[in-house]
Amino acid sequence: MATTSFSLPNHKFGIKLMLFLVLNLLSLQTSVFAHSSNSKFTKISRHPNSDSSSRTKPSTSSNKGFLSSVQLSLDHALFARSLAFNLTLSHRTSQTLMLDPVNDCLELLDDTLDMLYRIVVIKRKDHVNDDVHTWLSAALTNQETCKQSLSEKSSFNKEGIAIDSFARNLTGLLTNSLDMFVSDKQKSSSSSNLTGGRKLLSDHDFPTWVSSSDRKLLEASVEELRPHAVVAADGSGTHMSVAEALASLEKGSGRSVIHLTAGTYKENLNIPSKQKNVMLVGDGKGKTVIVGSRSNRGGWNTYQSATVAAMGDGFIARDITFVNSAGPNSEQAVALRVGSDRSVVYRCSIDGYQDSLYTLSKRQFYRETDITGTVDFIFGNSAVVFQSCNLVSRKGSSDQNYVTAQGRSDPNQNTGISIHNCRITGSTKTYLGRPWKQYSRTVVMQSFIDGSIHPSGWSPWSSNFALKTLYYGEFGNSGPGSSVSGRVSWAGYHPALTLTEAQGFTVSGFIDGNSWLPSTGVVFDSGLL
């Protein structure tokens, strides 16, 4: 991965800000931990509705202490980022294997800095609880991911150890900030728009920040699009590779559209966090194909193995097939990794074996998309809803597969996997999921489940790990594999969610989709069917 430079939206970290952060570090530590000692940070309930997002403004009670806590996290993230960046400069000609996870941490720290900056410095009036909750949850996930990338290398030098230490310290600070936020968060949640109903694109649905020209663009068919770039392998477009087209996009806040004409593109692509609102439009599943073959067995860590990685907020993919062709014996091999907030994948295909789709972080929505794999082929720690998708377990090197491995590491994170009105099928014995992290959260609702799913439904990760703290649930499913009579009896498993509980995992209740999905032009069901 190329080293990225951190830039703030419409701002740059200058020398004065650097000095300001340094001078404030010790005083912030004192004020934050004094606040911590006088506060009881109660964990939110495992009940899904207790952390369903409300569209209210953040609470002003204890706001100063909370912002000081986030500022302290921002300071530490900046120091860690500086350390990682300096390490890449001093070791560019050596220790290239060690630099892979360092570059991962560098990119993740850039993303974290951007989110924390928005909370502390910008403090825009339209930032609501769901935004702040999402950013803090994602920032915490970023540090967990950095540590995971570092751990996948068998050894690294003292600088790498220092980065790992910074990541662990930052994890603690972010956990504290998240605790403070949730304890102060208003508990009221809107009950409107939870009764279901298909939501279609209409003019009044667009938020004020979507321009009229963008609305017309997002409503348009491929033939009507006026893309900023056209990729064609035969040279008939503006570019012959997707990477060239991405590099040609001008910086700005508007939507950038790239049309990928029918063909197979053998590339590994990274859309960094600073490249926002990118829309990739193909000519259809199986017609426009992006394929890579990186894998853990081939020397790439999980994060870097992705054929396509989208970190910039507002990412949209439509009518494209994403493939990792590494094969069933290659261990972790990601076809698509998404860490983009308010992202949409529509009418696409994601094809791999182990770890096909990495839903890394933030709010995501998948509609009418086929996802194929073997072990943990949907994993990560985003807040994600799958609707009208085909989840297909294929034959691999093992005799049993797992559809999901959700990675929620803190009970205050507003993350999880919601599979709604989908088809789950397979050609080998398969489990709906297993807990990758302590507070793993996954629900399957109003979906068809075929006979490939094991009667127990869910599998442990290792022994009794997370069986009491996970949250797994089912609601209104059908098909030969949908019976809950033989399911696991774990404390964290809910065989029959109530109507109210299930509503908490819908598009409107879980990812606040009514506020942003209309602007994308995608059809979606806001509530239960």
Curated annotation (Swiss-Prot):
<keyword id="KW-0378">Hydrolase</keyword>
<dbReference type="GO" id="GO:0004857">
    <property type="term" value="F:enzyme inhibitor activity"/>
</dbReference>
<keyword id="KW-0732">Signal</keyword>
<dbReference type="InterPro" id="IPR033131">
    <property type="entry name" value="Pectinesterase_Asp_AS"/>
</dbReference>
<dbReference type="GO" id="GO:0042545">
    <property type="term" value="P:cell wall modification"/>
</dbReference>
<dbReference type="InterPro" id="IPR035513">
    <property type="entry name" value="Invertase/methylesterase_inhib"/>
</dbReference>
<feature type="glycosylation site" description="N-linked (GlcNAc...) asparagine">
    <location>
        <position position="86"/>
    </location>
</feature>
<dbReference type="InterPro" id="IPR000070">
    <property type="entry name" value="Pectinesterase_cat"/>
</dbReference>
<feature type="signal peptide">
    <location>
        <begin position="1"/>
        <end position="34"/>
    </location>
</feature>
<feature type="region of interest" description="Pectinesterase inhibitor 35">
    <location>
        <begin position="36"/>
        <end position="180"/>
    </location>
</feature>
<feature type="compositionally biased region" description="Low complexity">
    <location>
        <begin position="50"/>
        <end position="64"/>
    </location>
</feature>
<dbReference type="InterPro" id="IPR006501">
    <property type="entry name" value="Pectinesterase_inhib_dom"/>
</dbReference>
<feature type="binding site">
    <location>
        <position position="332"/>
    </location>
    <ligand>
        <name>substrate</name>
    </ligand>
</feature>
<feature type="active site" description="Nucleophile; for pectinesterase activity">
    <location>
        <position position="376"/>
    </location>
</feature>
<feature type="binding site">
    <location>
        <position position="434"/>
    </location>
    <ligand>
        <name>substrate</name>
    </ligand>
</feature>
<feature type="site" description="Transition state stabilizer">
    <location>
        <position position="354"/>
    </location>
</feature>
<comment type="similarity">
    <text>In the C-terminal section; belongs to the pectinesterase family.</text>
</comment>
<feature type="active site" description="Proton donor; for pectinesterase activity">
    <location>
        <position position="355"/>
    </location>
</feature>
<dbReference type="InterPro" id="IPR011050">
    <property type="entry name" value="Pectin_lyase_fold/virulence"/>
</dbReference>
<feature type="region of interest" description="Disordered">
    <location>
        <begin position="42"/>
        <end position="64"/>
    </location>
</feature>
<comment type="similarity">
    <text>In the N-terminal section; belongs to the PMEI family.</text>
</comment>
<keyword id="KW-0964">Secreted</keyword>
<keyword id="KW-0961">Cell wall biogenesis/degradation</keyword>
<feature type="binding site">
    <location>
        <position position="302"/>
    </location>
    <ligand>
        <name>substrate</name>
    </ligand>
</feature>
<keyword id="KW-0134">Cell wall</keyword>
<comment type="pathway">
    <text>Glycan metabolism; pectin degradation; 2-dehydro-3-deoxy-D-gluconate from pectin: step 1/5.</text>
</comment>
<comment type="function">
    <text>Acts in the modification of cell walls via demethylesterification of cell wall pectin.</text>
</comment>
<feature type="glycosylation site" description="N-linked (GlcNAc...) asparagine">
    <location>
        <position position="169"/>
    </location>
</feature>
<dbReference type="GO" id="GO:0005576">
    <property type="term" value="C:extracellular region"/>
</dbReference>
<protein>
    <recommendedName>
        <fullName>Probable pectinesterase/pectinesterase inhibitor 35</fullName>
        <ecNumber>3.1.1.11</ecNumber>
    </recommendedName>
</protein>
<dbReference type="Pfam" id="PF04043">
    <property type="entry name" value="PMEI"/>
</dbReference>
<feature type="binding site">
    <location>
        <position position="436"/>
    </location>
    <ligand>
        <name>substrate</name>
    </ligand>
</feature>
<dbReference type="GO" id="GO:0045490">
    <property type="term" value="P:pectin catabolic process"/>
</dbReference>
<dbReference type="Pfam" id="PF01095">
    <property type="entry name" value="Pectinesterase"/>
</dbReference>
<feature type="glycosylation site" description="N-linked (GlcNAc...) asparagine">
    <location>
        <position position="193"/>
    </location>
</feature>
<feature type="region of interest" description="Pectinesterase 35">
    <location>
        <begin position="228"/>
        <end position="514"/>
    </location>
</feature>
<keyword id="KW-0063">Aspartyl esterase</keyword>
<dbReference type="InterPro" id="IPR012334">
    <property type="entry name" value="Pectin_lyas_fold"/>
</dbReference>
<keyword id="KW-0325">Glycoprotein</keyword>
<dbReference type="GO" id="GO:0030599">
    <property type="term" value="F:pectinesterase activity"/>
</dbReference>
